[in-house]
Amino acid sequence: MADVLSRFNSGKLWDFKGGIHPPEMKSQSNSQPLRHLPLGTDFYIPLKQHLGTTGNLLIKEGDYVLKGQALTKGDGLRMLPVHAPTSGTIKSIKPYVATHPSGLDEPTIHLQADGLDQWIERNPIDDFSTLSSEQLIHKIYQAGIAGLGGAVFPTAAKIQSAEQKVKLLIINGAECEPYITCDDRLMRERADEIIKGIRILRYILHPEKVVIAIEDNKPEAISAIRNALQGANDISIRVIPTKYPSGATKQLIYLLTGIEVPSGERSSSIGVLMQNVGTMFAIKRAIINDEPLIERVVTLTGNKIAEKGNYWVRLGTPISQILSDAGYQFDKHFPIFAGGPMMGLELPNLNAPVTKLVNCLLAPDYLEYAEPEAEQACIRCSSCSDACPVNLMPQQLYWFARSEDHKKSEEYALKDCIECGICAYVCPSHIPLIQYFRQEKAKIWQIKEKQKKSDEAKIRFEAKQARMEREEQERKARSQRAAQARREELAQTKGEDPVKAALERLKAKKANETESTQIKTLTSEKGEVLPDNTDLMAQRKARRLARQQAASQVENQEQQTQPTNAKKAAVAAALARAKAKKLAQANSTSEAISNSQTAENQVEKTKSAVEKTQENSTALDPKKAAVAAAIARAKAKKLAQTNSTSEAISNSQTAENEVEKTKSAVEKTEENSTALDAKKAAIAAAIARAKAKKLAQANSASEAISNSQTAENEVEKTKSAVEKTQQNSTALDPKKAAVAAAIARAKAKKLAQANSTSEAISNSQTAENEVEKTKSAVEKTQENSTALDPKKAAVAAAIARAKAKKLAKTQATLENNQE
């Protein structure tokens, strides 16, 4: 720090590297005093006119505002407010064309002036020393003052950041642009106010040295400042040589001290602060006169403007209106520049307003402006590097900008570029280098801004997560404290900790589950370890016994719940047999016809009884069909006994005994069987018909041949009917079996009446053959059955035995007759 002051106090001037001497055109505008333009009717005030963020609106559409009234309010020193340049009504707040080469829109307040130009209430002061540094900085901030030299950095923020660090305060009056003369005229005409503003700033910062630097091409301004100082030694004046860009911050500091500001750092890092002379004037007006920054001096120059000079211009005035008031000759072939020819920006739309940034409006003609020549390839001549006042390598930065290699651009210190435009001015290939560098800076800024927002979002997220975790921990701690208090309360009342007891129960339960899951084993005789299945086998045995018990219970229930209809039918059949037997014993051969009729009546009664029984029963049991067949056989035997001789009677008794045995076997079988198959009933009917036919043949002799043929046909018909019934019906209806039995009885009765005993032997043999055929049909039927029940097999065996016995007796009888 002492080095900076010592080098400055030496009085020596250092020349910076590079720089140029462009043709100077200041005389066009600096010969006329400062003037005011007519007050306009419409003003467009952008919400942001500085390097920072936009303030918050204090007004709305339709509001009436006064001159100097704040329209926005900031939350920090970098968020400067804007003020009404005159009194009037707020017509709208919407996007409007910006004073920028892009021509984009930005939020803007449209103020329609009322022509009264009425100020707000002001509180001017004479002695600024009555206020503290903080109060003065705050008033500077409230006035919306930004750097008027071109950077438009918020002045209050700049002063506050450099407070207690500044040893050398430099007031920049160099104004190195070849066309701009606003600072020159301001120093000539308002030197006293500039000096007062410098002293206000010195009061705030307390620097050891204060100096005003002015180029040697402004002798009138130098003289005016010296006259304003009146011999005071608190502020020094340094006249520097004219060279572009000596007005740049780093170059001017080097000129006065010979010290370079480190790359990427501010001048305050070496104890130096720099402000523009226009900014000093604005500070004086804000502190002493209590006037915000609502107007500034603007240079109107160029051969296209008739009335060249420097004018006081209200901020927000459309540029087209200013040029019109200054006698601008509109020509679409020649652009308008905001700023000087070296650093100025071409304006695409003249309706854009004047802002704090605009210090000059340049309207050149064909003598001052030529169309840019076509860009050519870089020839690596190094002219740009030689002329660069910041010691950069513009040709390298150009390649990095074109390839969008942002990392390399930053490595080659693109941020140190002051955009002076010298590189483009000296380039023989006519490459607009300054445009490439501005675009590259904008891209890098966007990337960093995006990264900054991402980092801020990450910080907010992490802070939120930390807060949520902290709240969760606090909640758990509260819950634990409440649970602990509850446990202590229960322990005091019951003498046992409930949580501890619950944990013990849980441990015991887990231990039991562990024991139950262990596999039991046993060791075999060979020493092998095998799983112990004793428990499993016991469980299986218990289940098997339970199933058997359930099955026996079901059988007992079925036996107990059998319908009584079957028993009634069996009783009726037994009564019929007894009656028929008595009638057979009492009647003689002479009364055969009447006995036959009586038997026939009995058969009809029995049939009607059976049919009634069938009608009264909702589901006829196959047992009834078997009983009916037995009755038919008994009646047939009785008729045969009546029509035969004494030997036939004995044979009939023998047959009756056989039928009784067969019936008893059938009844036993029926008792053992819960459901007789319908096919068995049909088989029994066929057997009965065969027996009846055989007996009839034994008792008849006169018409043996014809009767035998008739019987054969009847048997064949019966057999075919039975077979068809078996084929067409999967389960024969019991009623059909009863009908078949009745038909068999009728046929047997007719055969008994017609047959004689002459050809008994042949007829007996024929009947025997029929019985054998019937037996074979029965056996086939039994073999074709899909699932033969053991009970059915027992019934079939009993029938077979009865038939065999009957045939043996019949043969013996026939042999006796032949003898």
UniProtKB/Swiss-Prot annotation:
SUPFAM superfamilies: alpha-helical ferredoxin, Nqo1 FMN-binding domain-like
Biased composition (Polar residues): 554-565, 587-601, 641-656, 699-712, 755-768
Feature: compositional bias, Basic and acidic residues: 465-477, 485-513, 602-614, 658-671, 770-782
One matching Pfam family: RnfC_N
Sequence segments annotated as region (Disordered): 465-568, 580-677, 692-793
Membrane association type: Peripheral membrane protein
Family annotation (PROSITE patterns): 4FE4S_FER_1, 4FE4S_FER_2
EC number in record: 7.-.-.-
GO cellular component, one term: plasma membrane
Domain of life: Bacteria
Cofactor(s) needed: [4Fe-4S] cluster
Annotated ranges, domain 4Fe-4S ferredoxin-type: 368-398, 408-437
Enzyme class, UniProt record, top EC level: translocase
Keyword annotations of the record: 4Fe-4S, Cell inner membrane, Cell membrane, Electron transport, Iron, Iron-sulfur, Membrane, Metal-binding, Repeat, Translocase, Transport
UniProt: [4Fe-4S] cluster 1 binding residues: 378, 381, 384, 427
Function: Part of a membrane-bound complex that couples electron transfer with translocation of ions across the membrane.
Assembly and oligomerization: The complex is composed of six subunits: RnfA, RnfB, RnfC, RnfD, RnfE and RnfG.
Family the entry assigns: Belongs to the 4Fe4S bacterial-type ferredoxin family. RnfC subfamily.
Protein name: Ion-translocating oxidoreductase complex subunit C
Organism from which the protein derives: Haemophilus influenzae (strain ATCC 51907 / DSM 11121 / KW20 / Rd)
